[in-house]
Swiss-Prot record:
Source organism of the structure: Mus musculus
A biological process from GO: Golgi vesicle transport
Compartments, as annotated in UniProt: Golgi apparatus, cis-Golgi network; Endoplasmic reticulum
Lipidation (S-palmitoyl cysteine): 68
UniProt KW keywords: Endoplasmic reticulum, ER-Golgi transport, Golgi apparatus, Lipoprotein, Palmitate, Transport
Subunit structure: Homodimer. Component of the multisubunit TRAPP (transport protein particle) complex, which includes at least TRAPPC2, TRAPPC2L, TRAPPC3, TRAPPC3L, TRAPPC4, TRAPPC5, TRAPPC8, TRAPPC9, TRAPPC10, TRAPPC11 and TRAPPC12.
CDD domains the record matches: TRAPPC3_bet3
Main location: Golgi
Protein name: Trafficking protein particle complex subunit 3-like protein
Family according to the record: Belongs to the TRAPP small subunits family. BET3 subfamily.
Transmembrane feature ranges: none
Length: 181
């Protein structure tokens, strides 16, 4: 038997509420496992990074985006296409400097924190959605861009919005990542 030609792969989606509740349970378990918020934040970032390195392939296959020629194009693709595709939201984009390598994604609604009213007592340094920073950083690294991705504001910490800061550091050496023939 052979595979049918030109059949598009099926993409399975899970219920958003199930994903958000499962993520909440994961963060709660990490808070039990690690005493320091910094350790939980580091673990969430590492998990996100690993997800981002794999998610970028799915994103590029499904979105059919063309090659970007500037950091602002990349940020707009992340905000308008990637966030919409995977989280169902479109964050606002702002640029912070004249060299156009520092940007912010402003999330007026954060789906990962939908069922969270406040951070647990004694966990003021916890970045509940640090997974997102890791995902963005991992995906950017896979397209040869080093970036620093951090939370600048967080609704769960009393801010009016959730803001993710992205600073593009440099383009990575593509030769290092090419497959050897």
């Amino acid at each position: 038997m052979s595979r049918p030609a030109h059949k598009r792969p099926e993409y399975h989606k899970i219920n958003k509420d199930l994903f958000v509740l499962t993520y909440g349970a994961l963060v709660a378990q990490l808070c039990k496992d690690y005493e320091k918020d910094e350790d939980v934040n580091k673990y969430l970032d590492k998990m996100g990074y690993n997800i981002g390195t794999r998610l970028v392939e799915d994103f590029l296959a499904r979105s059919c985006v063309r090659r970007c020629h500037s950091y602002s194009e990349i940020i707009n693709i992340i905000a308008q296409v990637a966030f919409k595709m995977y989280l169902g939201i479109t964050p606002s984009v702002t640029c912070h400097n004249s060299s156009r390598n520092e940007f912010s994604l402003i999330l007026h609604k954060n789906p990962l924190a939908e069922f969270v009213e406040e951070l647990p007592a004694g966990r003021s340094a916890l970045c509940y959605c640090n997974l997102l920073c890791g995902i963005i950083r991992g995906a950017l690294e896979m397209v040869h861009l080093a970036a620093n991705v951090t939370f600048l504001q967080d609704r769960l910490k009393g801010d009016s919005v959730t803001e993710i800061g992205i600073t593009f550091l440099k383009k990575l050496d593509e030769k290092k990542y090419r497959r050897k023939k």
